[in-house]
Amino acid sequence: MFKKLLLALVFSAGTFLWSVSSFADGHCEGSTMNDGHTGGKYPQQYELSEYQSAAGCKMVFAENPNIVSINDTIQGNKGLAAVADRLPDEPLVVVPYDSIGSYGGTIKFLSNATEAGTSDMLSTRHVNLLRFADDLTTIVPNVAKDYEWNSDFTTLTFTLRKGHKWSNGEPFTARDVEFWYEDLMMNPKIREKPYPYLLVGGEPMTVDVIDDVTVRFNLPSPFPGLTATIAWSYNQFFMPAHFLEQFHPEIDSNA
């Protein structure tokens, strides 16, 4: 069951974005980089309100026409709610280069390390709080809405998206980040030793929940490379606390 709990991120279960303007016919086509919409605070992406202001359009949402039948093939999945109910209150808008893609077709790809049981392509199915932009240099928000360092790179604060949900409809909150780090990754009963990339100078960080949509990493020493670690890591920096806490004996006495 746990493996079915996915984070309903930007396009939520096959959702994509179209823009709707005040033109006489009520519609305008989706924008691309060629239309001059190159990004807001971060390259090639906007917050919804930011995009609507820049493009002079109001967005409406559509979905993969086959998503309901695909969802029904997974045993135990609930029926899908309406598109608007699946999206967070603050969805991310990613601007395509040339056109909005079409559903269907076959993708072919090469893998450099199949003998290691990994797949270059399949590894991209996971999303994290941050990601690298297409220039492979700029680090931009992904699951997170925004992030900010303090002046000496010892605290990293994430702002999450209001109304963000897991695939079962439960809220995705700062507690999911704290639970992942403090209760799972730093728990010696679960991992004898923490992963080196989760330490700074060999010392653990701490994670504080400021409110439901604000979470802060406190570092024992300056480490500006943490954002790059989060952006490239295959391992997600959050777990569904609402589901996993029932199996954690230090949290639930019935576990």
Label for each model-derived stretch:
Residues 65, 69, 124, 142, ...:
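Extracytoplasmic/secreted proteins, especially bacterial periplasmic and envelope-associated proteins
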Residues 25-104:
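N-terminal pre-domain segments of enzymes
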Residues 146-191, 216-218, 226:
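Aromatic- and charge-enriched surface segment that lines or borders ligand/interaction sites
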